[in-house]
Amino acid sequence: MARRSTKTPPPDDSYEEKILDIDVVDEMQGSFLEYAYSVIYSRALPDARDGLKPVHRRIVYQMNEMGLRPDRGYVKCARVVGEVMGKLHPHGDASIYDALVRLAQPFSMRLPLVDGHGNFGSLGNDDPPAAMRYTECRMADATSLMTESIDEDTVDFTPNYDGQEQEPDVLPAAYPNLLVNGSSGIAVGMATNMPPHNLGEVIAAARHLIRYPGADLDTLMKYVPGPDLPTGGRIVGLTGIRDAYESGRGTFKIRATVSVEDVTARRKGLVVTELPFTVGPEKVISKIKDLVNAKKLQGIADVKDLTDRSHGLRLVIEIKNGFVPEAVLEQLYKLTPMEESFGINNVALVDGQPLTLGLKELLEVYLDHRFNVVRRRSEFRRSKKRDRLHLVEGLLVALLDIDEVIRLIRSSDNSAQAKERLIEHFSLSEIQTQYILDTPLRRLTRFDRIELESERDRLNGEIDELTGILDSDAELRKLVSGELAAVAKKFGTDRRTVLLESAGTPAATVSLQVADDPCRVLLSSTGLLARTANGDPFGEAEDAKRTKHDLIVSAVPATARGEIGAVTSSGRLLRLSVIDLPQLPETASAPNLSGGAPIAEFLSSLEPDEAVICLTTLDESSPGLAIGTKQGVVKRVVPDYPSNKEELEVITLKDGDRIVGAVELRTGEEDLVFITDDAQLLRYQASQVRPQGRAAGGMTGIKLTEGAKVISFTAVDPAVDAVVFTVAGSRGTLDDSVQTTAKLTPFDQYPRKGRATGGVRCQRFLKGEDCLSLAWAGALPARASQKNGTPAELPEIDPRRDGSGVSLAKTVSVVAGPV
C-alpha cells in the first residue's frame, strides 16, 4: 500500500503577523490583581449586609424563584444545582452542591437556610453527604426572611454572567445573618473566619444600637457576650473574644462538653456530648488511639462512639482504675481535638471593599442596609398604594354618574373618542380613564360606592403611615426595631455554648493518678461491694429502707489506694484493693449500692460454699477482729497481717465448724453477743476474751446444749440504743421463707454473763416452734430486707426478754443497723 503524501499548506497571506512586546512584570501584576479581585469579590468573602457569599446568595435566591417555600414539597437537590449553575453560577455543580449542603447542616449553621431531606453528612465530615441525585431540599423557615420583600424594589439587581437573567446584588435579610451564621473563606492575600452567634442576642444588641447609636462595645457585649456555636461546647477565656469584637481579630478556645459517669459497675468514664465546632467524633477517636498506642496518653481503657440520631453525640471514654478522670480529661484537652482554638478574623465586603470589622461595625453595616431596605420598601408600597388610590378616586367619580359614563362610551365611535370625552367631561386622568374603559361593563356597574370610599380612606391612612416612616428617621428606626423583635420572638433559641472566664484550676497530672483520699468500703446484703467518694459518715435517710440493695451489712474506713480484708466463713482473710472497687456518687443520705459490683468479681478464690462474713481494715493499731463460730468458739485476732500475703488464716477451725459472725472492734469495750438456735443469748464484755495470734483456734465463747448451734455473733456498743431481733421457726422447715413469729427486744433487757456460760432465753416458743431460724443484735435504727434486697418491716419493740413473737407481714432474711 502506497504511503499517503503529506504536503505543508502554503502560508495564508490574508493574516498579518503581529507580535506585541509586553513587560512580564506588568502583565503578572495586572492579571494577578484581576484574579485576586475576582476571588475576593465573587467567591471567597461574604457581603457584610446579608452575610452571604455569591454562591450562597444565588442558591437562596434561585430557590425562592423556584417557589421552594417551607410549606411546599421537597425537590431533588440536583434540580436546584442545575438551575443555579445554568442561570447564575457557572462554576461547576460540585461547588454549588457543597455550598447547598452546608446551608442545610444544623451543625454548620446556627440557623440553617436550607431544609434538607436525606443524608446531608455528619459532624466533621466523617460521613459525607449523599449524591445530589438522592437528596432533596426546600427553603427553611428562616430563609423566607432573607428574601422577604425582594420583589418590592428593596435591593438592586444586575445582569447574570450571560446577560439573560437578573440577580440581586444583596438580599434584603430581615436579620443579621453574618453574625448569626458566621462565615469562613480563603481569598487571595486575605481570609475570613467568623463564628456563629445566638439570634436573640444579636438582635437584642442591634435593637439597642438602633435606640442608642453611640453605644460602646462593653454595652453591646452585655447582649452578645460571645459566640454561640451550633455544636455547643464550652468557650474558655473571653479576652480573645473581646479583642475580636473590638478590632475584628482575636482567638478563643473551644472545649468539648464532658461529664464523668459510671460507664460500668467498676469503672468511671468520660462521656462527651458536645465537641468543638467542626470537630467530629471519628477524628477524636483516631487521635486518642494513636496517642495510646504511642504511649503518650495513659489511663484510657477503651473509647466507644455511641452517637445516634435519636440521642445525638455520645462518645464514651472508659478510664482505667487508679486514674483520676479529671486528670485524664486535662490530657485529652491538651493532646486531642477535644480542645481547639478558633481564630476570629471578621473580614467582609463593605461597598465592594474587604474590611476587618468589629462587633459594632458589623451591626452598623447591617442596620444601614436594613434601613435602606425598609425605606425602599416603604417607597415602593406608597407608590403602589398611590396608584391604586388614583384608580379608586377615578371609579368614585365615574360612579357618581354611571349612566352618563355608559352613555358617553356607547355614543363614542371608538375607544379613543370615548377616552377623550370621559377626560373632558369628568376631568379624569388618562390612567383613570383607561382603567374605566378596560373594566367590563358588568363589573363597572357592580362597584359599591361604600366599599370604594372605605378603600379610599384605608389607602389614604396607609399612605400617610408610609409617608410618616419615610419622613421621620425615628419612625423608620422604630419599625426596623419592631421587625427585628418579631424575628427574635419567632426564631430565637436558647444559648447552646457555655462561656467560661477561664478553665479553672488544672487537675492533677495523670502520673499522680488517684489521690489516697479517705473513703468507706461497703458490703450490701445482696453481696454488692463499693466504695464511697469520701470518708464522711452518711445520713440515715428514711427512704433508704425503701431502696433496693441499700441494706449495708458491713462497712470499714479505708483510703482510695489502700487495701482492706474480707473475712470468709471458712476462716480466711482475703485482701481487696480499694481502687478496683466501683465508687458511689456523693450523697447526704444513706448510699444506694445498686451501683456496686458483686464481691465475687474481686475474690476469684472464693469456694462455692464459702461466704464473705464481714470486711475489716488491715490497720495494726485497731483493737482487732472478733470472731464467733457455729460451734460456739470465740476469738479476738491480733491485728498482724503481713503485707506480702494475699490470703491469711484468721482462725483454725475444727472439722464441721464455720464462722457465723465477725466484726471489727472499734474500742475494745464492746459486748460480744452469741445467739443460738435454741433461743439462748449470751452477752459479755470483749475484754473477757484474750487476743490471740492468727493461727490460734480461739476459746469457748458460749456453752451449747446438746444439738444446739450458734446462728448469730456480733459486738454491740453498750452505750448506744440497741435491740435484739429473733425469728422462730421449726427444725423440720428451716427454710427462712417459712417463718412463724418474730420478736424485737431492747438489748439492755439481757444481762451480762460470764464467757463460756449458757446465757438467757431470748424468745419463748409457741406451738409448732422449736428453734430460731434468724437472729441479729445491733444498734438502732434497724432495717430488714428479703433475700433479693426488697425492704421488709420489723415488728414493734417488745420489752419482754423471754416473751413470744408476733407474725410478720413479709419474710425477713437480713437485718442491719447503722454502719
Segments predicted by a language model, with ranges:
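Catalytic phosphate-handling regions of large nucleic-acid enzymes and associated NTPases
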Residues: 1-248, 310, 314-316, 549
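C-terminal interaction appendages of subunits in large macromolecular complexes
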Residues: 2-6, 15-17, 24, 183-184, ...
